[in-house]
């Protein structure tokens, strides 16, 4: 079995590389239909998804036409030999700069995978409207396989806690942010 997402894919903005070995080309600006503000109550797998495609049901929230920059990110020539992807076309939301959709092309420039990133935007203390959660579906067209993943698929349907949203009991930096503190927790 396995997953349709590789380490290079598993980043919520659609790109997990560095500018030292990658370059990119701007392709276009487009309005795209996306789910940017949603209710994670619908994110229960598989009931909250339109199967077998793994798309969110309407109960997740309202789809909106949002401004996107479309860019082609690829390795620089000296680093491209032997790399699995020749091109990564990212459809990035112009407000939050997250890749909401990524098309990945194999070394022969054939479409291999498409990955949807449903990046939820919410009120983040000190930042305002920013990314605060993600769900994803990766379709591997060459191997007829799909991986559906949701960060809200927990029994409490919680998004990550950020900054002052973190409950007081978890704001102990020594207990939760040091080896000695983690050793106390693991006892």
Where are these regions (language model features)?
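Flexible, processing/modification-adjacent segments and terminal tails
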Residues: 1-67, 78, 170-187
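A short, terminal or domain-edge coil/loop segment
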Residues: 154-180
């Amino acid at each position: 079995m396995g997953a349709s997402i590789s380490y290079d894919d598993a980043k919520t903005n659609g790109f997990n590389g560095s500018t030292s070995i990658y370059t990119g080309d701007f392709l276009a600006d487009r309005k795209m239909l996306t789910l940017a503000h949603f209710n994670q109550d619908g994110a229960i797998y598989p009931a909250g998804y339109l199967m077998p495609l793994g798309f969110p049901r309407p109960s997740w929230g309202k789809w909106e036409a949002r401004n996107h920059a479309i860019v082609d990110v690829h390795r620089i020539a000296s680093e491209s030999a032997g790399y699995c992807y020749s091109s990564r076309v990212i459809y990035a939301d112009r407000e939050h700069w997250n890749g909401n959709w990524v098309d990945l092309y194999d070394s022969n420039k054939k479409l291999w995978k498409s990955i949807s990133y449903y990046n939820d935007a919410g009120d983040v203390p000190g930042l305002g409207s920013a990314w605060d959660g993600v769900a994803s579906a990766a379709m591997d067209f060459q191997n007829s396989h799909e991986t559906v993943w949701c960060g809200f698929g927990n029994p409490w349907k919680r998004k990550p806690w950020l900054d002052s949203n973190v409950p007081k009991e978890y704001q102990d930096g020594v207990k939760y942010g040091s080896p000695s503190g983690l050793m106390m927790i693991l006892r």
